[in-house]
């Protein structure tokens, strides 16, 4: 099979997602009800968000493909950063020199750098450089992501789970947003 490339970023191929399932006899198979190639949603003018999977319950109901039906519905109307009681798996392609707005989400986000080097910057001014394979655990903090390269795209994968509202010294922090969207819309993590 030929390598599928993004026209805007030829160094990053279009990601695929393969969903396993069971046939009528209980044998493990690949589900073919949804195309493997992940569609891209352009956010903030240029960055691309690929919704790899999403669930709305925990534990996840795998009976009668309930989770696949739920995920399929999100392909036409993407979920927000997190889903109440569920999970969101997303691949984010960050343009050269791209930077999100400073934002806070009521979620815990596990982010892994797949390509490039990405800065994770906190509102305190602290920052870390994440290189390929590095992991960030973002715990509802005010933060932004920045691609360190001005010539190459960066790619991260995020698993996002809903979190309880954060309270510090009796005050609720709430979900402060970035990218011009609220916590229930498809913004970055």
Curated annotation (Swiss-Prot):
Coiled coil: none annotated. It comes from the Eukaryota. Keywords: Virulence. Pfam families: Cupin_2 (PF07883). The keyword Transmembrane helix does not apply. The keyword Hydrolase does not apply. Part of the gene cluster that mediates the biosynthesis of the phomopsins, a group of hexapeptide mycotoxins which infects lupins and causes lupinosis disease in livestock. The role of phomC' within the phomopsins biosynthesis pathway has still to be determined. The pathway starts with the processing of the precursor phomA by several endopeptidases including kexin proteases as well as the cluster-specific S41 family peptidase phomP1 and the oligopeptidase phomG to produce 10 identical copies of the hexapeptide Tyr-Val-Ile-Pro-Ile-Asp. Belongs to the oryJ family. This is Phomopsin biosynthesis cluster protein C'.
């Amino acid at each position: 099979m030929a390598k599928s490339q993004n026209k805007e970023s030829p160094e990053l191929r279009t990601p695929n997602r393969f969903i396993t399932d069971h046939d009528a006899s209980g044998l493990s198979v690949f589900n073919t009800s949804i195309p493997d190639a992940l569609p891209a949603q352009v956010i903030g003018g240029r960055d691309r968000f690929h919704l790899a999977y999403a669930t709305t319950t925990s534990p996840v109901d795998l009976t009668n493909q309930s989770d696949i039906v739920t995920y399929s519905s999100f392909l036409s109307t993407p979920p927000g950063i997190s889903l109440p009681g569920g999970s969101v798996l997303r691949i984010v392609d960050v343009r050269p020199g791209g930077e999100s707005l400073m934002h806070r989400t009521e979620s815990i986000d596990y982010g892994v750098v797949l390509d490039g080097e990405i800065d994770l910057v906190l509102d305190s001014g602290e920052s870390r450089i994440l290189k390929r394979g590095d992991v960030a655990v973002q715990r509802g903090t005010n933060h932004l992501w920045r691609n360190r390269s001005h010539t190459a795209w960066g790619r991260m994968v995020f698993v996002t789970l809903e979190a309880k509202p954060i309270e510090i010294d009796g005050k609720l922090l709430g979900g402060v947003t970035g990218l011009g969207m609220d916590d229930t819309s498809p913004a970055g993590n």
